[in-house]
Amino acid sequence: MEKIFQNVEIKPFLIDFSNPFIKNAAKRLFQLEEQLPLVPVNVVMDFKGISRAAVHGLSRVLQDEIPNYMLDIKPGGYKIEDSTDLFMTEQFIRNRINFIPIYAKNETLVFALRSLNNSCEVKTIYSRDLIQVAGPKLKYPIFNPTFEIGFLQPGKSLIIEDIYIKKGIGRKHAAFNLAVKTHFSHLDIEQYPTDKKEYMALSGYKQSSMTSDPRHHRLGLCFPAVPLPHINQAVRTYLKNACRIIIGRIQSIQKIYENFEEPQPELVLFSLDEEKTKAIITIKDETHTIGNLLKTCIYEMIPDISFVGYQCVPHKQEMVLTIIHKASQEDLITLLEKSIQNIIQTFQILEKNVDELIA
């Protein structure tokens, strides 16, 4: 297979200190005379030779299906009895703290917020006001000091203890999203000029991506908190981790049909007639990301297949894949294995390309 990862543009969002207004504001508000320790990084990547489903899968995993961290308040951490500003409700403050972008590797860190407004004006509480109260001493900040958390009226106070680092994935809570603003387009489908009505009324493409089978794609996204000295290293790690997660999730499906001749609840195989076989595979804790990827790859590997489809069952937290094909049970499992191996190979090559392209 040829090189999949064709090109990448990594562009950090830096403060423009050449602008006097921005320079003065940064110094006045945050005593900043140099760049923030963490920066948002826009990444644009070009891929060639893979399906729309593969790019969509990578996009989904990078955004909300890869483990990441957020700040949260432990039960009882919001000290209502010690806080005198009743307008700053717990849920309001919790949401603001949750959505502070962080770059964390140590879950033992604990922070606190102990703020008192002794002035005659409304005081803005920033993330810089969070103080570390537990865990190893930080060599490098895990969040920027510039995010607004709340406001204090004159003479009022706000006390929060036990602000800890929580691990999760974005599809459970948006604050865990590793990447934001993900979007992708197809470079090998002719588009309408942007000034034409057709561009605004439809998708912008002259042919649907569902029928044209595009193989050249551009994926864009933003990582909101990346250490300034290690931008390329962090981006490379994120992309490789996403590939490994997809490979791992696909490999877990292999275990379901390894012993297909033995009865098991996750796999139902039976003959519809003398020629066709139907397979129903139940995959726990799986999403549309893998379902769409499997469906597309199976179609590509078996163009004359009778049917392949999937359904996510949210209340059971499972995905059900259904395949009908004119083949014996053994042959159907063999074809499924070839499709699985094709997906694994694609993302193994992509992971290798990431190392080659991002130094």
Swiss-Prot record:
GO molecular function, one term: protein dimerization activity
Compartments, record wording: Host cytoplasm; Virion
Annotated GO CC locations: DNA-directed RNA polymerase complex; host cell cytoplasm; virion component
UniProt function note: Component of the DNA-directed RNA polymerase (RNAP) that catalyzes the transcription in the cytoplasm of viral DNA into RNA using the four ribonucleoside triphosphates as substrates.
Family recorded in the similarity comment: In the N-terminal section; belongs to the archaeal RpoD/eukaryotic RPB3 RNA polymerase subunit family. In the C-terminal section; belongs to the archaeal RpoL/eukaryotic RPB11/RPC19 RNA polymerase subunit family.
Gene Ontology annotations of biological process type: DNA-templated transcription; viral transcription
Keywords: DNA-directed RNA polymerase, Early protein, Host cytoplasm, Transcription, Viral transcription, Virion
Protein name: DNA-directed RNA polymerase RPB3-11 homolog
SUPFAM superfamilies documented for this protein: Insert subdomain of RNA polymerase alpha subunit, RBP11-like subunits of RNA polymerase
Top-level lineage group: Viruses
Source species of the chain: African swine fever virus (strain Badajoz 1971 Vero-adapted) (Ba71V)
Pfam families, alphabetized: RNA_pol_L_2 (PF13656)
Subunit details: Part of the viral DNA-directed RNA polymerase that consists of 8 polII-like subunits (RPB1, RPB2, RPB3, RPB5, RPB6, RPB7, RPB9, RPB10), a capping enzyme and a termination factor.
Induction: Expressed in the early phase of the viral replicative cycle.
Main subcellular location of this protein, as a coarse class: host cell
